[in-house]
């Protein structure tokens, strides 16, 4: 639909498109709560956001189509990178999420949900949190200004996943697409094999990386200098606040939405690097990270929803680049659809392998020794 749009027009549309998307999406949260109560079917409407994100968005994403537009490196990138509007937009959306979270806690306790409805509301809000809190948190923790970096930490704390702030930057970005990275899924590895390892490793590794960092600085691990202690303390404060407002069920809601937000993140991690590995050079070392080591997706609608996270190839090659100037690389491995669609496919391993394994094999054509399966090199596809 927009593939032949004038690049300057497209960039202007996208500038306001990120907020416009969420100006439509966020009101759907109270809408689903209201319609559920008015119709007397609140237990079913509690699942609306989850169903909309992974049922309707994939269809709309396909219909809207792709966005090949890249800003010009010499003129537009320097200007756009410094525009305050983009920074304020990201931070403002962070505060919107905090408001949504507390509103959702109120609805959880006062909308007359049965067990089915309570589970559905937790899943729906957790999924929204995975998109807003963790996605924006991810964008902001890569930035140097303290206001942005701290906001990223606050957003991750709001879904009890602060370890991501440390492990992602100091662990994942260093070891991405190697067997040392638990957030890089292996060729033929199922999502359900990937998830437990990712959750456990990333939590433990975050504390290990912070400890090593503090040791290099000559500071004690268990001290006020350990940022993970601060961020997890903020998570505890969130939980305590929900407990004071709504009792033990408020705590259950907060921890439940946190789990599903983190789950959404790790499923996206599974998608982003599936089967891709940095080649081993003649010296036995992994090559440097390039746009070839992440799957790229250029579907416009989901890129607006995710602040261009799907241009993941450029993000890993140049981690400090701001979301508005991330580039599409046609030569990077390309996903056949946006993340919302790929999320659904990942839940069904046979279907996922049918779609993705041929793409991985094509990428490594003539280099099967570079493929890994279960931590071992693959010598043949069979």
Curated annotation (Swiss-Prot):
Gene name of the record: alkB2
Catalytic reaction annotation: octane + 2 reduced [rubredoxin] + O2 + 2 H(+) = 2 oxidized [rubredoxin] + octan-1-ol + H2O
Topology in the lipid bilayer: Multi-pass membrane protein
GO molecular function, one term: alkane 1-monooxygenase activity
Record carries keyword Cell inner membrane: yes
Pfam families: FA_desaturase
Keyword Zinc: no
Pathway in which this enzyme or protein is active: Hydrocarbon metabolism; alkane degradation
Induction field: Induced by n-alkanes.
Name the record gives this protein: Alkane 1-monooxygenase 2
The entry's keywords: Cell inner membrane, Cell membrane, Iron, Membrane, Metal-binding, Monooxygenase, Oxidoreductase, Transmembrane, Transmembrane helix
Necessary cofactors: Fe(3+)
Domain of life: Bacteria
Annotated localization: Cell inner membrane
